[in-house]
């Protein structure tokens, strides 16, 4: 076997590999022994026909594909080792026409991590960030707490208005025919939430309990149910209940009810303290991000598409995981929004490229500065994970693969590298 690098361009390397005719002949014999039971040729018991007879009936190339599959892993790995190539994904293989008795030649195009250098990363100048807590910030938190502790109460002496919750029955029809999913009983709907088709909720404003209302709407052109998109519909609606939100008064009693404090002043001071801590952490995190961005802006490198695609896979999986906390999943989200997964992936691509680039740069700096993850730091991180997943740490360790542990260590190194860069940055 012989090999050579015939092209190296950015993150793409093209290898040419030659397999000696004798070695490929051995692979053909192995392929014959593996496949011979498939052939049923007259005059021979099934699987007993000699190789030459099988080739005569089915063509000399009958075993070529399997023979190549047999020989490829060995010669491909040998070529990678010879040229010190570490691919990030499977190769794109182009096999030249195979001629009996001659050497077999193929090319393999692989992506590799980019080669680059990072310099002048110590003492990076970034703007000092500072966020001050204002009275309106504290009031916003108090209002949010009051809103969270509000309750819905039934009203009977007035008509529906914006912000009310109504309990309704409805039956939708297109061209006088009821459609699937268009009928419900005692459905709750908050007026102004945009939960229903545009124009539906507004037509209930001013109506009273017990009224039967004919609501006329047109489904949006981009509506997820294609058979309804753009069509006019009539909903027969009956209003059973009207409820309004009762928000508690923000006073000492409120503070006692919603917190561990006895007075509103104590609650307010605690909120202020937490907001100031959040503001401080926000400033620190933004400064850290600015340091990374300033360094990354000075480095030009191409990211292998396979690595970017894997990062997008991770981002999609994380997005799907977060959707599940809202009672959704990725498939339903795509259907609901009329978005194709390919389009969503493309929307994520710029962030994926940025994430991978930053990680590569931080890994390079970490290696130059001899930053490592100690056993104690790994153990501390595993303890945090065990607590997060509500799991015994020994059980967690048992379930983790070596590659998982390596990824955790890499995360620790990246965090420590950012710490190093932030500590050595100049705030201006």
Curated annotation (Swiss-Prot):
It comes from the Bacteria. InterPro entries: PPIase_dom_sf, PPIase_FKBP_dom, Trig_fac, Trigger_fac_C, Trigger_fac_C_sf, Trigger_fac_ribosome-bd_bac, Trigger_fac_ribosome-bd_sf, Trigger_fact/SurA_dom_sf. Residues 163-248 form the PPIase FKBP-type domain. Pfam families: FKBP_C (PF00254), Trigger_C (PF05698), Trigger_N (PF05697). The keyword Isomerase applies. It is an enzyme of class 5 (isomerase). Disulfide bonds: none annotated. It catalyses: [protein]-peptidylproline (omega=180) = [protein]-peptidylproline (omega=0). GO terms for molecular function: peptidyl-prolyl cis-trans isomerase activity; protein folding chaperone; ribosome binding. The keyword Methyltransferase does not apply. It is found in: Cytoplasm. Belongs to the FKBP-type PPIase family. Tig subfamily. NCBIfam families: tig. Consists of 3 domains; the N-terminus binds the ribosome, the middle domain has PPIase activity, while the C-terminus has intrinsic chaperone activity on its own. Involved in protein export. Acts as a chaperone by maintaining the newly synthesized protein in an open conformation. Functions as a peptidyl-prolyl cis-trans isomerase. This is Trigger factor. It comes from Alkaliphilus oremlandii (strain OhILAs) (Clostridium oremlandii (strain OhILAs)). The gene is tig.
């Amino acid at each position: 076997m012989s090999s050579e690098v015939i092209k190296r361009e950015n993150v793409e390397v093209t290898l040419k590999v030659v397999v000696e005719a004798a070695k490929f002949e051995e692979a053909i014999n192995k392929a014959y022994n593996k496949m011979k039971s498939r052939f049923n040729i007259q005059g021979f018991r099934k699987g007993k026909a000699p190789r030459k007879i099988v080739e005569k009936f089915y063509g000399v190339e009958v075993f070529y594909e399997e023979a190549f599959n047999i020989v490829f892993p060995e010669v491909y790995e040998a070529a990678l080792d010879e040229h010190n190539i570490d691919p990030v994904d499977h190769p794109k293989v182009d096999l030249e026409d195979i001629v009996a008795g001659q050497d077999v030649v193929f090319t393999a195009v692989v992506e590799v991590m980019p080669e680059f250098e990072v310099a002048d990363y110590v003492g990076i100048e970034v703007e000092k960030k500072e966020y001050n807590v204002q009275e309106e910030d504290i009031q916003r938190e108090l209002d949010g707490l009051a809103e969270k502790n509000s309750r819905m109460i039934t009203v009977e002496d007035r008509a529906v208005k914006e912000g009310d919750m109504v309990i309704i029955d409805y039956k939708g029809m297109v061209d006088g025919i009821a459609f699937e999913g268009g009928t419900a009983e005692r459905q709750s709907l908050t007026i102004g939430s945009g939960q229903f088709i545009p124009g539906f909720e507004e037509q209930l404003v001013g109506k009273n309990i017990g009224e039967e209302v004919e609501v006329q709407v047109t489904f949006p052109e981009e509506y997820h149910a294609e058979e309804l998109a753009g069509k006019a519909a009539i909903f027969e609606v009956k209003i059973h209940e009207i409820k309004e939100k009762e928000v508690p008064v923000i006073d000492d009693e409120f503070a006692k009810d919603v917190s561990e404090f006895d007075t509103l002043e104590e609650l307010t001071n605690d909120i202020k303290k937490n907001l100031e801590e959040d503001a401080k952490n926000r400033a620190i995190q933004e400064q850290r991000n600015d340091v990374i961005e300033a360094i990354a802006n000075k480095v030009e490198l191409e990211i292998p598409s396979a690595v970017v695609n894997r990062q997008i896979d991770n981002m999609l999986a994380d997005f799907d995981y977060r959707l599940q906390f809202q009672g959704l999943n990725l498939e339903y989200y795509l259907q609901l929004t009329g978005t194709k997964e390919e389009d969503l992936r493309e929307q994520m691509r710029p962030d994926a490229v940025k994430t991978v680039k930053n990680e590569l740069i931080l890994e390079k700096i970490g290696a130059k500065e001899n930053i490592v993850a100690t056993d104690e730091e790994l153990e501390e991180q595993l303890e945090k994970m065990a607590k997060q997943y509500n799991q015994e740490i020994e059980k967690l360790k048992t379930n983790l693969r070596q590659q998982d542990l390596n990824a955790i260590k890499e995360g620790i190194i990246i965090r420590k590298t950012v710490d190093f860069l932030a500590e050595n940055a100049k705030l201006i």
